[in-house]
Amino acid sequence: MSRTSIILVLAIFVAIAAIAQCRNIQYDVDEISPEAAFRYAQWGEIPHKRVPSAGDMMVRFGKRSV
């Protein structure tokens, strides 16, 4: 077998494994909130940064006093 065919076979194997894994993701449809219904259990809680308001940024950069 040539080098290209070996790489092609490995790429196909990885693609099949990825498709099989994504089909095994378990999710809860019975969640109360609509946004929680699309959150997968394996992912857990993703920490979110707080976005500062325009007033916070004005205070930070000296455009407005507290």
Curated annotation (Swiss-Prot):
Its main location: secreted. Residues 1-22 form the signal peptide. Keywords: Amidation, Cleavage on pair of basic residues, Neuropeptide, Secreted, Signal. GO terms for biological process: neuropeptide signaling pathway. Residues 23-48, 65-66 form a propeptide. It comes from the Eukaryota. The keyword GTP-binding does not apply. The modification Phenylalanine amide is found at F61. One of its GO terms (cellular component) is extracellular region. It is found in: Secreted. Belongs to the FARP (FMRFamide related peptide) family. FMRFamides and FMRFamide-like peptides are neuropeptides. This is FMRFamide-like neuropeptides 24. It comes from Caenorhabditis briggsae. The lineage of its organism: Eukaryota, Metazoa, Ecdysozoa, Nematoda, Chromadorea.
